[in-house]
């Protein structure tokens, strides 16, 4: 018998959410006419980086229901890996987003998930604005730079 999502560790939800989001990103790019592998990789990296995921989460937060917010909190507060190219706060928001995606996948809320994913284009590449082709930001902007204190407390536990 399959386990309920409620019994799963938040990092397990994030693990699933990571692959679901990555698959959507790759499919999205292919459906939009990108075919060169180097370009696909460069663009996919912009979509899946922690800063982009954290900004997308911040954008959809006001539209999440109580259960979804609870999943985000669990993911954000889970103790897990260490960020590679971003700060801890941004990394945790991204983990919260991935946990939410895992929750949506396990509960069959595909329409909700796709609604969120379809809003990501506006956040892709923000960290790289002003840089030449092929250059990427060494460190991402912290999501806390974009949040007001009230917004930070809304997602804090």
UniProtKB/Swiss-Prot annotation:
Biased composition (Basic and acidic residues): 130-141
Cellular localization per UniProt: Cytoplasm
Active-site residues (renumbered): 18
Cofactors that this protein relies on: Mg(2+)
EC number(s) reported in the record: 3.1.26.-
Subunit details: Homodimer.
Pfam hit, one: Ribonuclease_3
Protein name as annotated: Mini-ribonuclease 3
UniProt-annotated stretches for the region Disordered: 126-157
SMART domains: RIBOc
Keywords linked to the UniProt accession: Cytoplasm, Endonuclease, Hydrolase, Magnesium, Nuclease, Ribosome biogenesis, RNA-binding, rRNA processing, rRNA-binding
GO BP field: rRNA processing
Location (main, coarse): cytoplasm
Family membership: Belongs to the MrnC RNase family.
General function of this protein: Involved in correct processing of both the 5' and 3' ends of 23S rRNA precursor. Processes 30S rRNA precursor transcript even in absence of ribonuclease 3 (Rnc); Rnc processes 30S rRNA into smaller rRNA precursors.
GO cellular component: cytoplasm
Gene Ontology molecular function terms on file: ribonuclease III activity; rRNA binding
